[in-house]
Curated annotation (Swiss-Prot):
This is UPF0324 membrane protein Atu0671. Belongs to the UPF0324 family. It comes from the Bacteria. GO terms for cellular component: plasma membrane. The chain crosses the membrane at residues 15-37, 50-72, 105-127, 140-162, 172-194, 201-223, 233-250, 263-282, 287-309, 322-344.
Length: 347
């Protein structure tokens, strides 16, 4: 009887933990299934997919959020899918990469990424101030556009003592602009004459969030996805030094100090460990394909959650100056990124 009770406790704990998340997870799963079916329908009708399942998941999720009031009970599961499932997917993605790819990045590219982040921060902030935005709001927009979107905004807010309304305004448009960028990105390779590697670099440098990079690069295949992910994660690693610097500048060293695990998220560590495991043959070949499939499924679900988290109507509250500042920042980032590609190509 005691043994039965002992076995029941973990099961009951799992149910208590999963129950609040289940409605939102199921909605994300339904949107993901619709996206996968829509992609297959395109292939059957036209011979190929104009829009991949990753982009479709964002589109369907955004459309659903804009047309229907989602139940409050689903919010926890949607947030879980957008954050935790994404983090797991990114960590697992490391199993599809090896150290040889990382070596190919080279010191010039890594240095270029750091320089672009720094220049983008300075010029984006300057553009925001020229448009009349308050200093802290301009800082949030600069951090969001230059590093990793909403995550950078959320991390920078306590470091600079930002007001909640400034955080909400910057996040509102950054989320929508990120989705727009993902939808337009796949047209750039042909327009700019970029190959898969160059496009991966461009997407990794300009797109806000990791799932959006995956969605933007997927149409060009595995090389673009792998390159874009590596560049994006190197960019994310700049978050720690930037937040530490902002804390000192704004005198928030006590309130805004972040722990190491906040500056270097666990999934980046997991991503690197999976690369190491793959490189040293610690992952059996038979597991590589299932792990890649699981990572892809979780990524689709996280992007469905991303779409379900974007309310286009919130743009009304963001304000015209915020929209212009964020758009100018993104254009500037694109110009700098294209310049880095030309520089690495010449080298």
């Amino acid at each position: 009887m005691a043994q039965h009770r002992t076995l029941a406790h973990p099961f009951q704990f799992s149910l208590r933990w999963l129950s609040p998340l289940l409605p939102g997870i199921l909605i994300c799963a339904a949107v993901s299934c619709a996206a996968i079916l829509a992609e297959r329908f395109q292939v059957r009708i036209a011979g190929h997919a104009w829009l991949g399942d990753l982009v479709l998941a964002i589109l369907i999720g955004t459309l659903l959020r804009s047309l229907v009031s989602l139940p409050v009970v689903a919010s926890a599961g949607i947030k879980f899918s957008a954050k935790t499932l994404l983090e797991i997917a990114v960590a697992l993605l490391g199993a599809s990469l090896s150290l040889s790819i990382l070596k190919g990045a080279g010191g010039l590219l890594i240095g270029g990424i750091a320089l672009i982040v720094a220049l983008s921060l300075v010029f984006s902030y300057a553009a925001g101030r020229m448009l009349g935005l308050p200093p802290k709001l301009a800082t949030l927009i600069a951090c969001g556009n230059s590093i990793c979107g909403n995550s950078a905004i959320a991390a920078a807010a306590p470091a600079i003592g930002a007001k909640p309304e400034d955080v909400a305004a910057s996040i509102a448009f950054t989320a929508v602009l990120g989705v727009v960028a993902v939808l337009l990105m796949p047209f750039l390779p042909q327009l700019l004459g970029l190959d898969a590697t160059q496009y991966g670099i461009f997407a990794g440098l300009t797109v806000y969030a990791v799932p959006q990079v995956l969605a933007a690069t997927a149409p060009l295949g595995a090389v673009a996805v792998q390159t874009g992910t590596i560049v994006k994660l190197i960019r994310v690693l700049m978050l720690g030094p930037v937040i530490a610097t902002l804390s000192v500048i704004h005198g928030q060293s006590g309130k805004g100090r972040l722990k190491l695990q906040q500056m270097v998220p666990w999934f980046i560590i997991g991503f690197v460990l999976m690369i190491m495991a793959r490189s040293f043959g610690l992952i059996p070949e038979a597991l590589l394909s299932p792990v890649a499939s699981l990572s892809n499924i979780l990524t689709i679900m996280s992007m469905a959650a991303l779409g379900l988290s974007v309310d286009i109507r919130s743009l009304r509250h963001a304000g015209g100056k915020v929209i212009i500042a964020a758009s100018l920042s993104l254009v500037l980032l694109g110009v700098l990124s294209f310049g880095l590609i030309l520089l690495t190509q010449a080298a």
